[in-house]
């Protein structure tokens, strides 16, 4: 069998010998999908941008640097069994592999383009697969406030990754601001790690609990209730919590020096060395968008997500999305969705019939219903307020190109009707992040100026490569037979 040797000793099949399924992402959804697919006799390759399996939620699970396991909650440590199940499944694992493109061949196979290696010596190669499961996870929602580009301002997610992967915690004064479960979770983890959290500035709007009350029954009967109550009590007992914060700004000359905020109509400042911001996470849609999958606006979660069926199937044949990449559902539900997507692939490729697929999916579907119980309550309670999703004035929106909210709003008033036109007006979304930091904010600002829903505005039209790629690396990519034939057909017409 032809094989291709990568840097670091990882051996992959030649693109002429396809895998049955390629899984992108090694979080709970990807790990479960790969293990289930391999268990059904499918040749499976798991492509992971990180150095070790676990994704963001289980980052560092295979070799945690933390001496005190109690700093991270029990939900984190259960990821170890998921990683073990994957490792013994027989699936091929490719770490540090950034998937930057996917192309469908005329014969229905998918060419997955990935980059791997050390900085300055990366190589791009093709992996062919009959089916694709995208489990690329989520990223934090943009939280553009005045001064958020100052040194000393980070996201809560970035701070938690430092804690999980290297055991690093801040040494000076720290303030957390925003809304959502992760904000409170990090505060509790910091307290256990001995970090002094000076304040937690809660941006959850007044009256939001009343709005979420219609979903309270599901929440009260879920596992989230007891965990959430315990978390809130731990933090409130030891941290100054300021509720109903309606304005935030980071201030300082060359680095963060203080946080200015307004709550209940009263303005105040806090001197601090570190400000950690968070207002929820959103699906990572860059890959599925560039592939051409249909997407829709989720009003409750205020984000775009791929259109999927009950198995995670998208509008492209044999392409599935599992986990938070398809809509925020949490780690447990993501794992179950990975199982379901793999069962659908096994059925689609003829390894199991529909009756077997449905029988094996019965218990996972019950588990999925349990895992999603209470999710609607969180989505309603912690939906970020408009004021923090739609900044104004000189607040930087696009960090890559240093474009302000006022510039985006002005372009919209001058006739720019959507994010793709905005690229021509201001280059928003054309930097290295490809819209991850600004995409939703740009959409929301245009929607505000036009007086329409973000669904009517849409999102950036993304193209490959979806991650930064050196031109030399692209030029060295081995050509496929289809690409060579395309050149022959083109040159033959002249």
For each predicted feature, which ranges?
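Residues forming the flavin
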Residues: 2-432, 436-494
């Amino acid at each position: 069998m032809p094989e291709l040797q990568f840097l670091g000793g990882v051996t992959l099949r030649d693109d002429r010998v396809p895998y049955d399924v390629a899984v992108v992402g090694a979080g709970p959804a990807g790990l479960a999908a790969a293990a289930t697919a391999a268990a059904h006799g499918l040749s499976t390759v798991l492509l992971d941008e990180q150095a070790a399996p676990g994704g963001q939620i289980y980052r560092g699970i295979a070799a945690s640097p933390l001496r005190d396991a109690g700093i991270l909650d029990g939900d984190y440590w259960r990821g170890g069994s998921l990683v073990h199940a994957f490792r013994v499944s027989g699936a091929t694992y490719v770490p540090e592999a950034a998937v930057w493109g996917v192309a469908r061949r005329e014969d229905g196979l998918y060419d997955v383009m990935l980059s791997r290696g050390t900085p300055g010596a990366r190589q791009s190669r093709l992996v062919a697969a009959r089916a694709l499961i995208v489990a690329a996870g989520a990223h934090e929602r943009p939280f553009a406030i005045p001064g958020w580009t100052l040194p000393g301002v980070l996201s809560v997610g970035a701070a938690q990754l430092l804690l999980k992967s290297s055991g690093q915690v801040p040494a000076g004064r720290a303030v957390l601001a925003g809304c959502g479960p992760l904000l409170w979770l990090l505060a509790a983890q910091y307290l256990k790690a001995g970090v002094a959290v000076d304040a937690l500035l809660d941006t959850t709007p007044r009256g939001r609990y009343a709005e979420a009350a219609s979903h309270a029954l599901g929440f009260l009967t879920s596992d989230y209730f007891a965990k959430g109550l315990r978390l809130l009590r731990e933090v409130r007992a030891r941290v100054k919590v300021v509720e109903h914060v309606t304005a935030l700004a980071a201030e300082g000359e060359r680095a963060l020096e203080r946080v200015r905020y307004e709550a209940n109509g009263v303005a105040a400042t806090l001197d601090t060395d570190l400000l950690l911001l968070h207002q929820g996470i959103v699906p990572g849609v860059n890959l599925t968008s560039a592939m051409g999958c249909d997407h829709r606006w989720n009003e409750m979660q205020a984000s775009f997500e791929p259109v999927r069926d009950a198995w995670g199937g998208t509008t492209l044949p044999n392409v599935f999305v599992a986990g938070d990449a398809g809509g925020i559902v949490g780690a447990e539900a993501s794992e179950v969705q990975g199982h379901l997507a793999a069962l659908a692939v096994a059925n689609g490729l003829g390894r199991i019939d529909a009756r077997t697929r449905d029988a094996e999916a019965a218990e996972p579907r019950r588990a999925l219903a349990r895992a999603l119980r209470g999710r609607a309550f969180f989505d309603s309670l912690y939906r970020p307020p408009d004021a923090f999703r739609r900044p104004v004035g000189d607040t930087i929106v696009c960090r890559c190109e240093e474009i302000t909210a006022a510039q985006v709003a002005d372009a919209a008033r001058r006739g720019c009707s959507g994010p793709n036109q905005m690229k021509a007006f201001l280059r928003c979304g054309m930097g290295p992040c490809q819209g991850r930091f600004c995409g939703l904010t740009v959409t929301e600002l245009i929607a505000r100026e036009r007086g329409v829903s973000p669904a009517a505005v849409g999102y950036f039209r993304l193209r490959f490569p979806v991650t930064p790629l050196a031109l030399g690396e692209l030029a060295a990519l081995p050509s496929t037979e289809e690409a060579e034939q395309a050149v022959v057909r083109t040159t033959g017409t002249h």
